[in-house]
Amino acid sequence: MRKLLLLIAASLLGVGLYAQNAKIKLDAPTTRTTCTNNSFKQFDASFSFNEVELTKVETKGGTFASVSIPGAFPTGEVGSPEVPAVRKLIAVPVGATPVVRVKSFTEQVYSLNQYGSEKLMPHQPSMSKSDDPEKVPFAYNAAAYARKGFVGQELTQVEMLGTMRGVRIAALTINPVQYDVVANQLKVRNNIEIEVSFQGADEVATQRLYDASFSPYFETAYKQLFNRDVYTDHGDLYNTPVRMLVVAGAKFKEALKPWLTWKAQKGFYLDVHYTDEAEVGTTNASIKAFIHKKYNDGLAASAAPVFLALVGDTDVISGEKGKKTKKVTDLYYSAVDGDYFPEMYTFRMSASSPEELTNIIDKVLMYEKATMPDKSYLEKALLIAGADSYWNPKIGQQTIKYAVQYYYNQDHGYTDVYSYPKAPYTGCYSHLNTGVGFANYTAHGSETSWADPSVTATQVKALTNKNKYFLAIGNCCVTAQFDYPQPCFGEVMTRVKEKGAYAYIGSSPNSYWGEDYYWSVGANAVFGVQPTFEGTSMGSYDATFLEDSYNTVNSIMWAGNLAATHAENIGNVTHIGAHYYWEAYHVLGDGSVMPYRAMPKTNTYTLPASLPQNQASYSIQASAGSYVAISKDGVLYGTGVANASGVATVNMTKQITENGNYDVVITRSNYLPVIKQIQAGEPSPYQPVSNLTATTQGQKVTLKWDAPSAKKAEGSREVKRIGDGLFVTIEPANDVRANEAKVVLAADNVWGDNTGYQFLLDADHNTFGSVIPATGPLFTGTASSNLYSANFEYLIPANADPVVTTQNIIVTGQGEVVIPGGVYDYCITNPEPASGKMWIAGDGGNQPARYDDFTFEAGKKYTFTMRRAGMGDGTDMEVEDDSPASYTYTVYRDGTKIKEGLTATTFEEDGVAAGNHEYCVEVKYTAGVSPKVCKDVTVEGSNEFAPVQNLTGSAVGQKVTLKWDAPNGTPNPNPNPNPGTTTLSESFENGIPASWKTIDADGDGHGWKPGNAPGIAGYNSNGCVYSESFGLGGIGVLTPDNYLITPALDLPNGGKLTFWVCAQDANYASEHYAVYASSTGNDASNFTNALLEETITAKGVRSPEAIRGRIQGTWRQKTVDLPAGTKYVAFRHFQSTDMFYIDLDEVEIKANGKRADFTETFESSTHGEAPAEWTTIDADGDGQGWLCLSSGQLDWLTAHGGTNVVASFSWNGMALNPDNYLISKDVTGATKVKYYYAVNDGFPGDHYAVMISKTGTNAGDFTVVFEETPNGINKGGARFGLSTEADGAKPQSVWIERTVDLPAGTKYVAFRHYNCSDLNYILLDDIQFTMGGSPTPTDYTYTVYRDGTKIKEGLTETTFEEDGVATGNHEYCVEVKYTAGVSPKKCVNVTINPTQFNPVKNLKAQPDGGDVVLKWEAPSAKKAEGSREVKRIGDGLFVTIEPANDVRANEAKVVLAADNVWGDNTGYQFLLDADHNTFGSVIPATGPLFTGTASSNLYSANFEYLIPANADPVVTTQNIIVTGQGEVVIPGGVYDYCITNPEPASGKMWIAGDGGNQPARYDDFTFEAGKKYTFTMRRAGMGDGTDMEVEDDSPASYTYTVYRDGTKIKEGLTETTYRDAGMSAQSHEYCVEVKYAAGVSPKVCVDYIPDGVADVTAQKPYTLTVVGKTITVTCQGEAMIYDMNGRRLAAGRNTVVYTAQGGYYAVMVVVDGKSYVEKLAVK
C-alpha cells in the first residue's frame, strides 16, 4: 500500500517540476459530487474539485496543454480550446420540465503561464477507427485563439434525451471552467451548489409508469442515474417476472423448441410469434409495428417484455438503415417511444438455417445449464488491445490495463488472464482453443475479422474449443454488420458448431476510438492517461461485475452505450453522439444469458419433499437474490426471488392441479444453476433419509446419510388391547434378529431410596399361580437361593438374585435381554429390605407387572418403564418393530437406479465419469417408498490422461522457446485425474471447530471469532471467522496479534492451501495478515517464516459497490504452497489498528503426493560446459569445476548410458586441489538418490561426498550424508580405451552403483569433489531420484518432440528452450508422461526465419537522479544485416562474407583452423607481415619457406603477428595448430602472409598448397577492419589448401533506436545504454529497436513506473534533517514538503522548515532546473 501511496504522491508532486505535466490545487479539499434531498419535486446537488491537471500534448498543429478534472470529460467546439465538463444522467418525472437554479459557487482565476503551460489544446472531433490519423486534418480555429476574455458555456445546462424503459432521461451538464486564450488564464468555478426542480411533475403517473415497466434486469441501467433513489425500491421480482417477446422466422419453429423449453424452465414468461402469422408479417414495417404494439399492450397491463429475441437472418427479419450510422440496425424494433433509447433488451440469434440456430442453442444450453465437463476455462480471459501506432498507446493499452487492474485478476477468481495490451501478440488466439470464458478485442476490424492481430471468420471456423464457449466483445469496426453479403465475423463466431462463442457484442458500422474507450471503462476517461474507477462513470467492465444485479450480455452492452451517452456534449457536435452508438452496437447470439465471472458459486438451497396441489404459492429456500421457477413440460407455473433471508415465495400464475414431476430451476448471477424435479401431491407418509452428504476423491464418490428420523413409516401407530383396561403401543424400531425379541427394563430411582427392580421371565410359562402369585409379594423373608435359576430362564439384570437386600437390581438406567420370540410368564419384582419382602410391582401403568402366558413377538422390542402411580408403582410398556427388514435403501445417479437393497447408511462408487452428477437415496418400506433425498456431486478431470494446456511456441533467431501450463486438474496414474487428497476443508458454518487453536498473543481478550456479528457474511455461505482491529459496542481501537491455527496435518510432501479473505469494511480495508507453516508445534513461537504476508488495501477492493458505499469488501481467493513436512498452518492478524475486521473463510488444504521419479542422464548437456539444469560452485576458485564430457569427443571415455557424463578433475595437465559442488534442482520429496561413478583405475583416490540442503543452494547450506574415497577399483580389470592426448593413457574404471537415503525435508542434493589432489578425475552418470509418497496427481513429467522426434524427456518445468534450430517450419509437441500412460500430444508450429532481424535482450529502465537510464544487451547474433555474400578475390578464388561481431571497429581478426589434416600430428603456422615487404624475398613465390635450419629470429625479424603466438622457425616444432584453432587480432590494413606446414621427415618448412579457395601465400592482401578471416586447412588431392571465410565483425553493423511512449527520441546509437534526462517522475513505455542495413528488428519494450520519484542517494545539492518531528530542508533553490496524498505542506527558497504529525512525507528540491525527490518517515 505504501508504494501505491508514493506513486500517487509522485504524480501530485508534479507542480512546476517538469514541462510534461502540472497540477493546480483548487479551493476544495476533495473532488466530490453529491445528490441530496431527492424527491419527485426536486433534488439538490453539489460539485467540488480539488485540482486541475495540465498535460503537455504534442500534435500535428504544435505543442499544447490538455486540461482535465477528475470525473470530467473534454468539451468544446471543434477547433476551439478544450475545457472539461461534468455530465450526469438524471431521471425526470412524467410531465416535468427540469429547471436548474445555481445557489452558490466560488470562482478563482489561474494563470497557466506560471505553470509553464502552453495554450489549451483545440478540441478535436471523434475519430473513426477506419480513419488514418495521418490523413485527418488537425482542427484549429484561429479566430477562437484570437478571442480575448473568458469564453465558455453556461455554468449549468440541462437537456431532455428521451425515455428509457419507463424512465424519462435528461442530461445535466456542469461547466466549471472558462478560458481566456489570449491571457492564457483559467477561470474555475468551484464548490457549486445547485437545485434542480421538476416543474409540472406528475408523481402518480411517474410512479405508475415506473411500476409498469420495472424489472430488476434493468438495475444496471438505473444505477447510472444521478438521482436514482427517487423511485421506490423494488426488492422482489415475482411481482415483475421476466418476460420475453420472441419473433422468429417460420422455418425455425422446430429448432427453437429446446431453447423455449429451457427459458420457460428458467422462469421466463414467453410470448412467441413467427413471421408466417398475419399479425407479424414479413416486412420490416409490419414486424416493427407488431413489436411496438406488444410492448405497449404489455406496459398497459404491467407486463411489458424485458427481452426481445429476434431469430433469423435479414432474409426473415431485415432490420433497417440507421438514421445516424447509415448501416443496418435493430434498434428501432425496441425503441418504442420515438427516441433512440430502447425499451427492451434486444438480441438477434442470427441464423440462415435451422441447423445454424441449433448450433447457437446447443452452446447456450450447455453454458446456462453449466453442463460443460470442465469449468476451469471460465477462470481464464483473453484481453487484446490491437495494433495502432497512434491510438494503441493512448487508448488501447489503457483499456486493457483498466480491465486487468480492477476486474480480470486473481482477486476476482481468474487464474489466467491472457493480456495483450500491445505487440507482440504471438500466439494470442491459441487461448481461444484451449479455453477462455471471456474474450475482448479493441482496435481495428472488418466485416469478417479482428484485424491486427488478425483472426478471420475462416479461422474461427477452425477453432477447437468444444465445450468451452465464451462471450466475445469486439470494440472495432463493422464486425457485427449482419446484413453483409456473407456472414459477418460476429455471426460466424456464434453460428459455428461446437466452437466459438455463445454470444457476441459488436458494432454494425465503424466504431470510434473515444467512444469505444468510454464504452469500456466509462465516460470522463482522458486519452493517454490510465483511467481510474473513481474518475470515470460506469462502463461495460464495471457493469459486468456488479455483484447484486441481473447481469446479462445485453445489460453489458447497455452500460457501454450509456457511458457513451454520458460523454456527449450539449450544444457542441464534438463526439459522434449517443444516438450513433445505440444504433451501432448489437448482441448476436443469446443476450439474455448471465455470463459467469470466473468460477461461479454454488447455490445453497432446500427443496420441499413435494408440492401440494392448488396452492397459490410455495416457499423454497435458496441463496439470497436467486430467481426460482416452477414449470412442467415447458409451461411456466410460477416464479419468485429469494429474499435476504434466503426464502423465495414462488407466486403461482398457474396452480398445480395434478400429480406428477415438476421442474424447479434456481438461477442467480454468477451462481451455478439448480435444476431439479419435485413430485406434486400430498406429503409422503414414508420418511426419507436425512443429512445426506457426498464427497469425492478422484473419481470415487462416497455417500453417507442418517437413517429415517423415526421408524414409523411402515404403518400408522398401532394401539393394541392386551387386557382389561390395559393397552400396549406398537411402533417401528430395529435391533434384533428376526426370530428374537428384546425385553428392556428401565427405571429412574422410582422410590428415591435406591431400591430398584428385577425382571423374571419363565419360558415354560408354568410358574404363574405357583411361583408367581396372582397377588401379593413373590416371597417374604428368605427364599431358596435357587428360586430364580430353577424357575426363570431369563433375568434382568442377568445376575439378579432372590435376596431382598440385593444390589443386583435396576435402580436408575436400564437393562435388557434378548429372548426367543414366544409365550412367557413374567413378573417384575421390587425388593424392599425394610419389610423383608420381595414385592411384585403394582399395576398402575399401562401393563401388568405380572403376567400369565404373555406373547413376546419375534422382531419386537418391549420396553417396560417403571414409574410411581399414586401410592404404588406401575409399568408402562412400549413395543417397537425390531425387524431388520423393515426397510432398505435405493441409490440413484442422474435418475438411474444403481444400487438397491442396501441396509448400511453409506455407499461408494468408483470410476465415475467427470462432470456434474445428481445422487439420490430413497427408503423402500414394505408398504411404499419415501421421497428421494438428493445431492449434487462434481467429479473433476476427465477419463483420459490429461494433456498440457495453453502450449505456445516462439522463436528469436534460431532459439525456440516453448511454454505451457500444467494439465487441467491434477491427473494421476489411475489413469483418471485426481484433484488430490483433501487433508482439511473448513467453511466455519458451525463456528471454529474445537480441533483448531486460537492464540490471543496481544492479550486484549479479542481473538479470532466465528462470524455471527451483524453484517458479516461468508464467502459462499453464512459462516466465516473474523478478527478485529476495531471493536464495536464501546470496545474501540484494537492492536491485534491473533493466531488461528489448524489441527495437526500430515503433509510429508507439502501441499497447497487455498482460502478466501476480505476486509469487512471496504472503506477501512488495511488489515494486515500473514500465513505461516510449522513442522514442529502449534505455539506462536513455532511460526516464524511467513509464506504469505500482505495488507488488504482499499485499492484492492474492486467491487463497484464496495468503493462507492461502506459495505463488506470483496472476497479474494489466495493460494499458498506449503513446504514438505508441514504439521500446522497459522493465520495471523497483526500490524493493523483502527480498521475494522478481517474475514476468513473456505480454508482448504490438499496434500501433495509423490513427485515423479526422474533420472538425470546429462544427454542434453554440451561437452566442455557446465551441465544443463544443474548448479555448479567452484569453491576453490581455480576455474575448473564440474563439466560435461562426451564419449564422442574423448576416446578414453565410456558413459554408463548414452554418451555424456559429468566430471571433476584433481589433475588436468597439472595438480589441482578441487572443491567443486554439483547441485541438483529442487528435489523436494526425494527419499533416495542412486547414481553411478567412475575414476581413473590407476589413480582411484578422488574423494567425494553426497550432501543435502533443506534451504538454499549456497555451499554453506549443505551437510554431508555420505562420503567415500574410491580405492582399488577393478585393479587389473578392463580398460575402456586410451586417450590420444599428450599426457598419455587415462584408463577408466568400471561404473560403480551407489544408493544413498535422503533425510526428510531434503530440497537440494550436491555432489562435492574435495579433499584430494594430483590424482585424476571422478565421473558421475545416470543420477536417479526416488520421490516419496504414493502416486498422486503430480506424478508426471513432460516429453518434447520436434518434427516427430523425441528431443527431451523427464522435464518437470513448464518451459523448454532449444537453440541452433535449423531454418524452416517445425512442429513442436509436448506430451505428459504418467506412471500408467501418456497423454495426447499438444502441438504448435514454429518458424525459424533466416532473415529475421534479431532484437536487443534484457532491456531494463531504472531511475538515476531525475533521469531514466536504459540498459540492454546486444542482439544474440549479428547475422541480420543482410544475406550471405560471395566475393571474388582472384582467379578462381572466392571468399564468403557473412555477418558476425567480435572485434573493435579499426581491427580485424585472423583465425587459423585445422583438424589433423595429415593424420601425423603435423600442423600449421600463420605468419603476417604488416610492412608487406617480405613477399618475393622472405616469402618465396613458390617452394618451401626454408629447408634445414633457419635463423632463430626469422619470424620475429620479419613477421609482426603469428598464429600460434609462440610459433618458431623449427621444422620439428610443437608450436603449431594440429587440431583446433588459433587466432590473432590485427589492425586493419595491407599485409603479406603465408601459412606454413613444418615437416620433420623432409626437414622442410613447407608453405601450404593452393588447393582451397584462398592462396596460402599472398602479396599485399588487404585485411579489412571490422572483418573476421577464418583460414581453414584441408586436404586437397595429394596436397593441401586453404579455405578462407570472411565475416563482418564490425560493431557498427547496426545501430539502436529508442522510443518513449511511441515517439522516437534517439536513433543512431551504438552503445547499449541511453539516458533520458528529466523523465524519472512519470510513468513511460520505453522501446528499443535494432536498425540493420537491410531492415529493423522488432521493438523490445519495458514499462518504467517510478517508485514515488527516484531517490537521490549521492551528491545531493541539498541537506535534509529530521529532529524529532521537525523536517528542515536547506538548498540553493526551491524546496517543497508534501504528504503522501500529494498535499503541499510547506514551500520556500533556500530553507524550509515544517513540523510533522508523524507518517510518511516527500521532500522535493529544485536546483538549477533539476529536480530531486526524497521519501522519509517521521515517527
UniProtKB/Swiss-Prot annotation:
One of its GO terms (cellular component) is extracellular region. Proteolytically cleaved into a catalytic subunit and three adhesins. Arg-gingipain is involved in this post-translational processing. The active site is at H444 (proton donor), C477 (nucleophile). Ca(2+) 3 binds at S987, E989, S1021, G1023, D1145, E1146. It comes from the Bacteria. Residues 965-985 are annotated as: Disordered. One of its GO terms (biological process) is proteolysis. It catalyses: Endopeptidase with strict specificity for lysyl bonds. This is Lys-gingipain HG66.
